[in-house]
């Protein structure tokens, strides 16, 4: 995953986190939308640099009662406010998740309020989600936050088909922080990946940049 920080626009990559969905059930047999991720992760890069990244930065607007699980808190979990309320869960309680005979107990470190589907689910550490799936090392997708330049005609042309660009057009496009060029470069360094924009939030600090959320599907 650290390859994401090796692209030409590496300094425009703000944060990223893997996501892995698990179809699990709780102690009552009820289906619980479960997601494995990095909450706050220290990553050593091949360049010798290190970064701190994770869902705590990508979802900084979430309301958290309690705290985010620490990187080394193997059994820590975030529980959505809707699920917690309907099951009488508070910080410090235990949530038991099972998938196809594999069972794990998790401690509720925080209760999240997002205003979306996350409120109905449970978030756990990525290795624990992999253990429930019995698939070590697997990742479903990676969400990437990047600073990008607003699209123009060249960017839109490239987004449709990069191969339609002339040599000079492709050089200009590749060396400009368009969302399509950053997505293209992520696909170059991540084998068998597809990167696409999923959300854009305008930045208003006198700089013509946008903060774009990219979802890279592996």
For the regions a language model picked out, list residue spans one by one.
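Mechanotransmission and gating elements of multispan inner-membrane complexes involved in transport
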Residues: 100-103, 111-214
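Hydrophobic secondary-structure segments that place a key small or acidic residue at a functional site
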Residues: 18-22, 32-38, 49, 56-131, ...
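Selective detector of the "anchor" transmembrane alpha-helix that sits immediately C-terminal
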Residues: 216-218
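Acidic-residue sensor for enzyme active/binding pockets
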Residues: 13, 49-52, 74, 205
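Active-site/binding-pocket entry motifs
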Residues: 39-41, 201-202
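Short helix C-cap/helix-to-loop transition motifs enriched in small/turn-promoting residues
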Residues: 7, 40-44
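Hydrophobic, regular-secondary-structure patches
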Residues: 1-35, 184-194
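Short, flexible, mixed-charge acidic loops at enzyme active sites
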Residues: 49-54, 156-160
């Amino acid at each position: 995953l650290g390859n994401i920080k090796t692209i030409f626009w590496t300094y425009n990559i703000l944060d990223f986190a893997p996501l892995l969905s698990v179809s699990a059930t709780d102690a009552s047999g009820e289906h619980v939308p479960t997601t494995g991720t990095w909450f706050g992760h220290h990553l050593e890069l091949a360049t010798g640099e290190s970064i701190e990244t994770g869902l705590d930065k990508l979802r900084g607007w979430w309301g958290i009662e309690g705290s985010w699980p620490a990187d080394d808190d193997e059994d820590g979990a975030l529980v959505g406010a809707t699920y917690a309320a309907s099951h009488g869960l508070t910080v410090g309680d235990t949530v038991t998740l099972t998938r196809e005979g594999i069972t794990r107990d998790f401690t509720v470190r925080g209760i999240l309020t997002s205003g979306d589907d996350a409120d109905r689910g449970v978030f756990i550490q990525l290795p624990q989600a992999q253990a429930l799936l019995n698939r070590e090392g697997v990742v479903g997708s990676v969400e990437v936050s990047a600073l990008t330049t607003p699209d123009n005609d060249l960017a839109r042309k490239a987004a449709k088909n990069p191969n339609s660009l002339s040599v000079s057009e492709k050089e200009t496009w590749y060396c400009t922080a368009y969302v399509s060029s950053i997505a293209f470069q992520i696909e170059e360094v991540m084998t068998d990946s597809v990167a696409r924009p999923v959300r854009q939030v305008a930045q208003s600090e006198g700089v013509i940049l946008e903060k774009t959320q990219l979802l890279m599907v592996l």
